[in-house]
Amino acid sequence: MDQAKLARMQASVRIGTFYSFLWIFEVLVSESVFLRMTATNFIDRGKGTPRRKVKKVHKSSGADDKKLQTTLKKMNVQPIQAIEEVNMFKEDGNVIHFAAPKVHASVPSNTFALYGNGEEKELTELVPGILNQLGPDSLASLRKLAESYQNMQKQAGTEGKKDEDEDDIPDLVEGENFESNVE
C-alpha cells in the first residue's frame, strides 16, 4: 500500500492514539469514583425501597429546666407555700390565670418564679372571685366591662320585647278570612 494513501485514510478516519484513550479512561474512572463517594445514599436504593429517614434532633425542655433550676439555686430562692392562684393582668383586659402554681421567691434579688400551666382568660370569666385582686388600672377596665355588659342587657331586653310581640296571635281584620288562604 502506498504511504500517501495510508496517510489520507488515517486523516479521514482519525484513529486515536493510545495516550488519548488512556486520558479518556482516567476521566471516566475518576468520575465514577467521585459519584460513588458522594452519592452513597442514593445508589443502594432502587424502585420500591422506602425513603431515607431523616434523623430529627429534638431539643428537650428538660435541659432548659435544669439550667433554670441551677440559676435559681444560685440566687437562693425559697418556695412559697399555700398559694392557690396567680392572675396576671394584661393591657388588653385579658388575664393569664395560673391555678395552684408552684412559686419560688428571692426577696433580696426581687425575683419570683412561677411554675404551672397558664390559661389566658377574659376578665368576665373570673369576675366574682377576682374583685379583691384588682388594682386601679384594672378597675378602669372593669368599669368599661360593666358598661358594655349593661348595654348588652339593654339590647337583649329590647329584642325580648320584640320577640314577645311576634309570638302573639295577629289581630283579625273584619271581612278577611285567613283560612281560605291556607288551603
UniProtKB/Swiss-Prot annotation:
Bias kind Acidic residues: ranges: 164-183
Subcellular location, record wording: Cytoplasm; Nucleus
Chain ranges of the NAC-A/B domain: 62-127
GO BP annotations listed: protein transport
Keyword terms, alphabetized: Cytoplasm, Nucleus, Protein transport, Repressor, Transcription, Transcription regulation, Transport
GO cellular component assignments: nascent polypeptide-associated complex; nucleus
Record keyword Protein transport present: yes
Superkingdom per UniProt: Eukaryota
Residue ranges, annotated region (Disordered): 150-183
Subunit structure, as described in the record: Part of the nascent polypeptide-associated complex (NAC), consisting of egd2 and egd1. NAC associates with ribosomes via egd1.
Protein family according to the UniProt entry: Belongs to the NAC-beta family.
Protein name, entry field: Nascent polypeptide-associated complex subunit beta
